[in-house]
Each structure stands twice: as structure tokens, then as C-alpha cells.
Amino acid sequence: MDLPGPIHDFLLVFLGSGLLVGGLGVVLLPNPIFSAFSLGFVLVCISLLYILSNSHFVAAAQLLIYVGAINVLIIFAVMFMNDSEYSTDFNLWTVGNGITSLVCTTILFLLMSTILDTSWYGVIWTTRLNQILEQDLISNSQQIGIHLSTDFFLPFELISIILLVALIGAISVARQ
């Protein structure tokens, strides 16, 4: 969207904080229904971020596929689960939680150091060369492919990681 700078920055901070709050809700809420609704909120915030960055097609695909199909499927599956195991015995901290938090914290600091040490100047020039190449393309699907592999590479990969985690979680729930 072509918004003035302060409004764009405010919406960016607002949606980013919504992502953080929703992500914490997914992880920390003990009731799986509330966690699934929080995941839906996170996915809607991501699609609004796509709209904010002028990628309306990806935002529509995000809403239709992830919020409209996958999140509804997760909520449907959670509602069929037996909720007695969540209400009776709820341990606040286990060894597995400690190991998981240690691994996630390590990955977070590695990602932060990688982001801070990356020369973003070269990435900007690569993007500009792709924009020059994009003017010669005829097909919109080719333009979408170029945007997904350059401008929106990180969000696209994050969405694929979220799907992978959801599949692993579904498999582990099905085994129990």
C-alpha cells in the first residue's frame, strides 16, 4: 500500500506486535482451541503484512489456504480430541521443555547474529537487477515467482517451516 511513512511504520509495528502476541498465545496457552485461534490470528496478521507490502495475491493465497483451510482443519481436529488430558495433569516445566527452549534460544541468537552480520547492500542490488529483468517479462505468474524467490523469500520459507511443524505435530498427536 502506498501510505505515508508514519502510518506505514505504525501499521508495521502494530502487525509485528500482533504476530508476537499471537505467537506467544500459540505456544503458551494450555487449551489447544485457544492456541488454534491464536494461530489463526497470526496467519491473518501475516496476510495483512503482505497487503502492506503490496503483495495482494500472496495475501489472498495466505488467507484462503492457511486461514481458510489449514487453520480450520486444525481447529476441527482439536475439537475431536479428548480434552481431559489437558485439564487434569498440566506440568509447567519438563526436561523436554528445557531442551526445546535451549535449542530454540540458540537458533534465535544464531539467526539474529546472521541477520546483523549480513551485507544487505548486495541483496538490494540483486533485487534491483531482478526488477530490471522483471520489466521484460510478460506473464504475471513469472513475476510472482521472481517476487517469491527474491523479495518475499524469507516469509515464504517461514510459512513452509510453519507447515512442517504443523505436520510433525499432527503426526505426533496421531501416534498418541
UniProtKB/Swiss-Prot annotation:
Organism per entry: Olimarabidopsis pumila
EC top class, as a word: translocase
Quaternary structure and partners: NDH is composed of at least 16 different subunits, 5 of which are encoded in the nucleus.
Record-level Gene Ontology MF annotations: NADH dehydrogenase (ubiquinone) activity; quinone binding
Record-linked PANTHER family: NAD(P)H-QUINONE OXIDOREDUCTASE SUBUNIT 6, CHLOROPLASTIC (PTHR48479:SF1)
GO CC terms of this entry: chloroplast thylakoid membrane
Record keywords: Chloroplast, Membrane, NAD, NADP, Plastid, Plastoquinone, Quinone, Thylakoid, Translocase, Transmembrane, Transmembrane helix, Transport
Functional description taken from the UniProt entry: NDH shuttles electrons from NAD(P)H:plastoquinone, via FMN and iron-sulfur (Fe-S) centers, to quinones in the photosynthetic chain and possibly in a chloroplast respiratory chain. The immediate electron acceptor for the enzyme in this species is believed to be plastoquinone. Couples the redox reaction to proton translocation, and thus conserves the redox energy in a proton gradient.
Protein name (record): NAD(P)H-quinone oxidoreductase subunit 6, chloroplastic
Subcellular location: Plastid, Chloroplast thylakoid membrane
Chain ranges passing through the membrane: 10-30, 32-52, 61-81, 92-112, 152-172
Main location: plastid
InterPro entries hit by this protein: NAD(P)H-Q_Oxidoreduct_6, NADH_UbQ/plastoQ_OxRdtase_su6, Nuo/plastoQ_OxRdtase_6_NuoJ
Reactions catalysed, as given in the entry: a plastoquinone + NADH + (n+1) H(+)(in) = a plastoquinol + NAD(+) + n H(+)(out); a plastoquinone + NADPH + (n+1) H(+)(in) = a plastoquinol + NADP(+) + n H(+)(out)
Membrane topology label: Multi-pass membrane protein
Any single Pfam family the record assigns to this protein: Oxidored_q3
Source superkingdom: Eukaryota
EC number: 7.1.1.-
Record-stated family: Belongs to the complex I subunit 6 family.
